[in-house]
Amino acid sequence: MKRLLLLFLFFITFSSAFPLVRMTENEENMQLAQAYLNQFYSLEIEGNHLVQSKNRSLIDDKIREMQAFFGLTVTGKLDSNTLEIMKTPRCGVPDVGQYGYTLPGWRKYNLTYRIINYTPDMARAAVDEAIQEGLEVWSKVTPLKFTKISKGIADIMIAFRTRVHGRCPRYFDGPLGVLGHAFPPGPGLGGDTHFDEDENWTKDGAGFNLFLVAAHEFGHALGLSHSNDQTALMFPNYVSLDPRKYPLSQDDINGIQSIYGGLPKEPAKPKEPTIPHACDPDLTFDAITTFRREVMFFKGRHLWRIYYDITDVEFELIASFWPSLPADLQAAYENPRDKILVFKDENFWMIRGYAVLPDYPKSIHTLGFPGRVKKIDAAVCDKTTRKTYFFVGIWCWRFDEMTQTMDKGFPQRVVKHFPGISIRVDAAFQYKGFFFFSRGSKQFEYDIKTKNITRIMRTNTWFQCKEPKNSSFGFDINKEKAHSGGIKILYHKSLSLFIFGIVHLLKNTSIYQ
């Protein structure tokens, strides 16, 4: 009997422990949220006062403000997407308050900087290089010039610090969390830039890239606030990118030039039209889409067309098919009704065969995108589910082609919905059940059922080039015949149009027989 009583008491104790663990986790999440909102959104609630209804209402309002800034679904609730953003390493400068606006800049163009101490994570020369290149990001688009000094007081004093440090009113929090902070132009701490020494700083390996973080913090030291443009350098969260190919977004350029102006204008040199080469090892695509039994690859003013299971590749001007379409398209996809949608900036066009449908272009916001979305990076329609994924920076939206509405619960981070695809997507399409994501000159074959990358290849693998050729390879603008792996690239518009017509005539005839 005693054994039964002991077992019963053990069972009651063991089973009652689970709700306590869950409650503790919820409390920890709420405390994390309170600290985050205090630091970055001026919540100004001290201590553990979350149970008060007034304070909880303030927290909900600040969560809504934070969700709106990061492009999340605005609910005021501490959902998983909101927590994920709060736990992402970021800059220590607030997103609102006096730092939520672009501040007055320096009253001079020639600025000095000094590195007070160095991180042991990197060679001194590598730190010098990262700092110099971080400043050059801004001097390349403004009249600003930066000079390094080794003694005395510089306009921008740079240091690696930990936790509470010196007279600085901001502090660091150990590994992860806050990576750095900087102060806007002015006397005293103005322009000073600090990096958290508890982080693992790196040039190109595992850890946090010093150049990327420094370039961001120097934006603050020059007077910029945070941007909610997810492609901007001044976006508050750390995004791992290839530093060698890192461009400032137009939002960054507009912001810094609103303070200091642009570079002196030089006489514009007439540009010769560039023609992309299929076997260029650095070839990238603006957009890719299927069209019935074809795949179309868009680049500048041109497109390549390949047919399923046929080795011929055709190369044409976009205008030879659709004269009213602009060049430099940014995204394209085929919907379940055999129509192509192509996107550039805030507009999209719908194509049926050789015809651009009337009443186009239309605004992308008619599809359900919020006003902050200014362009689409890539799009792909899953033929099985009839759902279209739109990629915008590090986020993706999902559109229901049957109801013509955006799905609830989106946007989501790309890496969350497509594990392994961690940063922005340049182009995407579906072929034989797989998604193909292009980023730069690489393409990732992705199994959407197992959510795994199954193959990594060059973007021009589809053209079966035997060996990459130099991108400066010369060829006739009117006609190029390149024999690579049995592929013949045709430039004659009349012949390509004839083939296109015959293929689709045979297809349509077979369907209705």
From Swiss-Prot:
Keywords: Calcium, Collagen degradation, Disulfide bond, Endoplasmic reticulum, Glycoprotein, Hydrolase, Metal-binding, Metalloprotease, Protease, Repeat, Signal, Zinc, Zymogen. Matrix metalloproteinases degrade protein components of the extracellular matrix such as fibronectin, laminin, gelatins and/or collagens. SUPFAM superfamilies: Hemopexin-like domain, Metalloproteases ('zincins'), catalytic domain, PGBD-like. Belongs to the peptidase M10A family. Gene3D superfamilies: Collagenase (Catalytic Domain), Hemopexin-like domain. Ca(2+) 3 binds at residues 173-174, 178, 196, 199. Its cofactor is Ca(2+); Zn(2+). Zn(2+) 2 binds at residues 91, 216, 220, 226. GO terms for molecular function: metalloendopeptidase activity; zinc ion binding. Hemopexin repeats lie at residues 276-325, 326-371, 373-421, 422-465. SMART domains: HX (SM00120), ZnMc (SM00235). It is found in: Endoplasmic reticulum. Disulfide bonds join 279-465. It is an enzyme of class 3 (hydrolase). One of its GO terms (biological process) is proteolysis. This is Matrix metalloproteinase-27. Ca(2+) 4 binds at residues 286, 377, 426. Zn(2+) 1 binds at residues 165, 181, 194. Ca(2+) 1 binds at residues 121, 199. Changing residue 452 to Q: Loss of N-glycosylation. The gene is MMP27. The conserved cysteine present in the cysteine-switch motif binds the catalytic zinc ion, thus inhibiting the enzyme. The dissociation of the cysteine from the zinc ion upon the activation-peptide release activates the enzyme. Its EC number is 3.4.24.-. Pfam families: Hemopexin (PF00045), Peptidase_M10 (PF00413), PG_binding_1 (PF01471). It comes from Homo sapiens. Residues 1-17 form the signal peptide.
